Amino acid sequence: MKPLSIKAEEISALIKQQLEKYDDKLNVNEVGTVTYVGDGIARAHGLNNVLSSELLQFSNGSYGIAQNLEANDVGIIILGRFDDIREGDQVKRTGRIMEVPVGDQLIGRVVNPLGQPVDGLGEIKTDKTRPIESKAPGVMDRQSVNQPLQTGIKAIDALVPIGRGQRELIIGDRKTGKTALALDTIINQKGQDVICIYVAIGQKESTVKNSVETLKRFGAMDYTIVVEAGPSEPAPMLYIAPYAGTAMGEEFMYNGKDVLIVFDDLSKQAVAYREISLLLRRPPGREAYPGDVFYLHSRLLERSAKLNKKLGGGSMTALPFIQTQAGDISAYIPTNVISITDGQIFLEADLFFAGTRPAINAGESVSRVGGSAQIKAMKKVAGTLRVDLASYRELESFAQFGSDLDQATQAKLNRGRRTVEVLKQPLHKPLPVEDEVLILYALTHGFLDAIPVPDIQRYELELYDYFASNYNDLLDVIRTTGDLPEEAKLNEALKNFNEGFSISKK
């Protein structure tokens, strides 16, 4: 047997090679220990350098967000299920804040607040993410709202117009048509180059399913993302859902696109935040909400804006919902959100049950953007509509006490009844803006004064068909220029239609 020959040169070459490859960087993680877990909340000891809102990872792979930074421990809200997290488990810092996937790949999908698909259509392949919390655009980054966002709902586009980049609160009791209003607005964005995001917070799974089916039926899911945090989810998921939806919208807004985001509804988010705060032992304030509940909504809604040309001119229009109790809009959360937004649409239960749908109370509803968010034609026909409606409501209450009314008062009452009837609209039938202008022009110029109230809805439908067949050029003028066609031609066309319209026999 030959003796083993060891060559010193080979050994030194191998050692040199290993030394060159040697990585002396240590992977250091700051790790803490879970001391309490329950109700979507955990407390951990040992994370001395953790940052507020930092994303933390538990030993089982779950994530949480550092919410309370206290002297001896950290209060953490757990994202998702917490059944398999135990006292004594390790939790480590990640050094980043929570992010969600963003981009075109999310369009047409239903996702949870973490951006994970829940529609069974497979994974979402996107490598782009955005933090759920980000700074709102500053004053110099914005421009004033000057472009309308057509909802297709006559009462809104005429009385409380919404502009691209505006925040318009929709407020009312449960079952007064808030969700229907938002779905109709989303459906009306077809072909308008607007990306829509519908954030369902604490809505029943069956309700969300119906909403998604409605959007699919009208082809609206082609430009819509649905973010769903159901009532069976832990409170932290309901709390982060609106921020996740806004982050998805910001990706489009900062790329020069127009976005419409609907929060259905922020009352449930406030309740979830109250639950989290009480579990974290934060001092309760009015109605047991924590002291920073105003900031909860203001930092969310301020991220919706119309950006200036330098930043691409994109916009995000927010429609936050708030549910009231017995029509009380002076409660804590409603008054908070009213003061943050650029106006509110108040849906009244009494009007809804009396058959006025959408049940918009014109007196309580306001848009602080106003005429800037209307085309010229709409401004001309809807200018006096709000005042006329308010004076009709006033006269109507007085008219109940006596029948001896002068002719002018009687004429106002007649016009008011027809105005209320014209502003009614069936579910999921938003109108193009030229049709809205047409019927409101006919109303304000007296063409409906001789038409009995029960015939108004039939008159309206026949009017649209008549103009589409015989006077499409007049509708084209409104559609393309945004202004009224020659009034003489329009009056002539309406006069011709009225002559051929058959009034129902009593």
UniProtKB/Swiss-Prot annotation:
Q: Which residues bind ATP?
A: 172-179
Compartment(s) of residence: Cell membrane
Any Pfam family: ATP-synt_ab
Q: What is its EC number?
A: 7.1.2.2
User: Where does the record place the site Required for activity?
Assistant: 365
Q: What's its top-level EC category?
A: translocase
Mind listing the UniProt keywords for this protein, alphabetically? ATP synthesis, ATP-binding, Cell membrane, CF(1), Hydrogen ion transport, Ion transport, Membrane, Nucleotide-binding, Translocase, Transport
Per the record, what are the reactions this protein catalyses?
ATP + H2O + 4 H(+)(in) = ADP + phosphate + 5 H(+)(out)
Where is this chain primarily localised?
membrane
Q: Which GO terms describe its cellular component?
A: plasma membrane; proton-transporting ATP synthase complex
Q: What Gene3D superfamilies does its record include?
A: 2.40.30.20, ATP synthase alpha/beta chain, C-terminal domain, P-loop containing nucleotide triphosphate hydrolases
Q: How does it sit in the membrane?
A: Peripheral membrane protein
Matching entries from InterPro entries are given as: ATP_synth_asu-like_sf, ATP_synth_asu_C, ATP_synth_asu_C_sf, ATP_synth_F1_a_nt-bd_dom, ATP_synth_F1_asu, ATPase_a/bsu_AS, ATPase_F1/V1/A1_a/bsu_N, ATPase_F1/V1/A1_a/bsu_N_sf
In Gene Ontology terms, what is one molecular function of this protein? ATP binding
Q: How does it assemble?
A: F-type ATPases have 2 components, CF(1) - the catalytic core - and CF(0) - the membrane proton channel. CF(1) has five subunits: alpha(3), beta(3), gamma(1), delta(1), epsilon(1). CF(0) has three main subunits: a(1), b(2) and c(9-12). The alpha and beta chains form an alternating ring which encloses part of the gamma chain. CF(1) is attached to CF(0) by a central stalk formed by the gamma and epsilon chains, while a peripheral stalk is formed by the delta and b chains.
Give the family this protein belongs to, as stated in its UniProt record.
Answer: Belongs to the ATPase alpha/beta chains family.
- Sorted alphabetically, which PANTHER family does this protein's record hold? ATP SYNTHASE SUBUNIT ALPHA, MITOCHONDRIAL
Question: What does this chain do?
Answer: Produces ATP from ADP in the presence of a proton gradient across the membrane. The alpha chain is a regulatory subunit.
Cited HAMAP family = ATP_synth_alpha_bact
Q: What is this protein called?
A: ATP synthase subunit alpha
Q: Tell me what organism the protein belongs to.
A: Lactobacillus gasseri (strain ATCC 33323 / DSM 20243 / BCRC 14619 / CIP 102991 / JCM 1131 / KCTC 3163 / NCIMB 11718 / NCTC 13722 / AM63)
